[in-house]
Amino acid sequence: MTSQANPQALIEQLRLLTADPAAYFQDDVQKRDFQKLARQAATAVEEPFETMQRLVYGPLPLVTARIGQDRGIFDALAKSPEGAALDDVAQASGLPKGVLESVLDYLCTQGMALESQPGIYKPTSLTHMLLVPLFNDAVTHFHDNCLPAFYALNNVLDSPEQGKTAFKVGQHSEEDFYTWMETHPVQQGAFHRFMEAQFAALPTWLDVVSFDTEVAADVQPEDVVFVDVGGGNGSQCAALKKLFPSLPGRIILQDRPAVLSKALQVPGMETMAHDFLTEQPIHNARAYYLRQILHNYDDPTCIHILQMHLPALQHNPSSRLYIDDKVLPDAKPPASAPGVEYTAALSLAMKAMFDAQERREKHWRWLLDQAGLEVVEIRRFTRFDDAVVVARRRVQDQWR
C-alpha cells in the first residue's frame, strides 16, 4: 500500500517555500525537480473547466503585462511601496477606472500586483522585475512582434503561397520581420536589446572553442581570422576581441548597410556590406561564423546560404564554418524535462515569424551534407541546447 501525503502538511510546506524559496533547495537539480512536479500536480488537480479557462485565457498574462508597462501602471505601483489608490493609478495610466480595475484585478491573479486592501494596490517582486530593461524589452518584443504572428499561425500552416509567413499575415504586411522593424524603431530596439541581454549571463561558443589555439594558431596579421556573417551590431566580434585583445589577423563584420551603420565601435574590426544569400567574397578565412541565422530560414534557403560559402572554403584546409544555433537532441527528453517547453515554443516561434524551425542533430547533419559540407564536431554549451556546429567543405570536394 502506497503512503499518502498529508494534504494540510503539504500546503503548509508550500506556504513556507513561497515565503523563502531560496532557503529550500540544495541545488538547481532539486529545484528543477520541484518545478516539474509542481506543474504536474497543479494540472492533475484541475477540474476540466479550470483547464479550459487556463487554455483560452492563455494570452492574457502577456497582454496585461504589456498594458502594465505601456500605461505606466507598474511604474505607479513601484513608486508607491506602501500602496497606491485606484484613483492615483488611473491618473498615472490615463485609463478609465472601470477598465483599469479589471486590468489590476487580473494582474493581481498573476502576481504582478497585490491588492493589499480594497482599492489599494502594492507592487510585488514581479512588478519590479517587469520594469527591468531585459523583461520590459521581452514583453514588448513578444507582444508587439510575435503575438500577432502566433494568432495567424493556424491560418498559414497549409498555405501554398511562397513566403507567406504568419508574421506577415498577423502584421498585415508584405515585409519580412527584419525589413518591417526598420520602420518600427520601438519594436526593433526592444528586439535587439532583448536578444543581446538574454544571453549575457549564459555560456557562449567561446567557452567551448579555444579560439586562439584551435582557430588562430599560426595566423599572420594579413590573414582573415574571423568573419561574422550577418553579425548585426558586431557583439561577437567585440566578445572575441575582449577575450583575445592581441589576436592576430583580420576580423570582419558582415551585414546590410543599414545594420552596419549602427554597429559597435570595436578596435580592429572591419565592416563589409554583404548579403549572405550571395556568394561569400572573403576567401580562405579561418572562421566563418553564423550565429542564429539558419534557424530563421527553411531548408532550401539554408542549403543555399551554406553553398554560398563553398568557394570561400575551397583552398584553405583550415577554413571552417562555425554555426552557433540550437541543436536539439535526436532522442527527445521527457516533455516535463527542463528546457523542453522553451525549445518547443521557440521552434513554433520560428515557424510563425520566418516559416522556419529549430533543428535536431540529425537534421543539421543532413542539411550540411546537402550543401556539400561535413560536420567536424558539435559542441554544446548551455542546457537549452545551444551549440556550435563546426563544419568544413566535404573532404572529397575540398580542392575541386
Label every model-predicted segment:
Residues A5-V45, G98-A197:
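N-terminal auxiliary segments of SAM/dcSAM-dependent transferases
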Residues V139, L153, G189-F199, P203-L206, ...:
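Short, Φ-rich (hydrophobic/aromatic) sequence segments
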Residues P123, A200, D255:
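Single, functionally critical "micro-switch" positions that shape active/binding sites
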Residues H184-A239:
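Loop-centered beta-sheet repeat module
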Residues S116-P123, K168-F177, P203-V215, L290-Y297, ...:
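Short, exposed beta-strand "edge-strand" segments with a Pro/Gly-rich flavor and a Y/T-containing core
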Residues D27, M52, K164, L202-W205:
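Short, flexible/disordered secondary-structure transition segments
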Residues T2-L104, E115, V215-R400:
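Alpha-helical subdomain
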